[in-house]
Amino acid sequence: MITFSSGIQPTSFWQRAGRFHFDTILICALLFLLAWGTIMIYSTSAVYAGLRYDNSYYYLQRHLIHVILGFGVITLATLTPYPRWRDWLPLMMLIMLAMLVMVLIPGIGHEVKGGRRWLRIAGFGFQPAELMKVVLIVYLASYLERKRPFIQSFNRGIGPCLLVSGFYMLLILLQPDFGTVVLLATTVLMMLFVGGCRIWHLVACVSVVASLGVALVMTQAYRMRRILAFLNPWEDPLDSGFQIIQSFIAIGTGGWFGRGLGESRQKLFFLPDAHTDF
């Protein structure tokens, strides 16, 4: 959280840059997690990067570039007055719509392991669904602020924002990216609760979302296998349960505090993508 040093709001970028105060605890937590994550990136990727790229620092270097870019974005976003985000929101929504449609087009969207979720621009790859997480929060915050007098009405209050949010989530589901859709749906429901919608409206929304989620899981074999593997990975130890079993082995051999920095074994090609989201 960042606050200005006086009640007068600075008007220029440099005035804002010189007159805000950091939330020390939040910044320290951010830096700690960032440092720890960087160490883990190198620890899990060094062996694989050394074999594939002949450079054990390949993924670490790429990660540090992303960190620098991320700090730049955080700084600019922090120094941007909140009303500006509201003014830019229609353009942001249009850009997200274009990108989420583009990613579904063969030859434009980049397919990785069965999911077409990536766009590549000037050699830089990114997932539009990740950007949608931020844009959706901005949209909901702006909508709930504007519709505050009608928030307890379904037709004039939460209904329209549910339709808009659902449409964007449908585009993401077509990639398919079920996990991101679940996260976005949870975000929408939480923001509606905080925004003051009627409890029975919220209960109805939760019921519909849960029913759709169960239906989507049961109608797709690979999703069902993931659920069953989570409950009992030993039924399919070489396929859907493989990574969970590897995590058991890692915890069993390392105990509470692990084997020591750089001494883990599961990264030694026992896992297909130890350096990504495992």
Where are these regions (language model features)?
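Membrane-interface helix starts
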Residues: 21-27
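Long extracytoplasmic/lumenal interhelical loops at the membrane interface
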Residues: 255-278
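Hydrophobic alpha-helical transmembrane segments of multi-pass inner membrane proteins, especially
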Residues: 27-35, 39-43, 49-243, 249-251
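Short, Lys/Arg-rich, polar N-terminal cytosolic tail immediately upstream
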Residues: 1-19
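A short linear-motif detector with a strong N-terminal bias
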Residues: 11-12, 19-21, 97-99, 248-249
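Acidic side chains
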Residues: 23, 177, 236, 273, ...
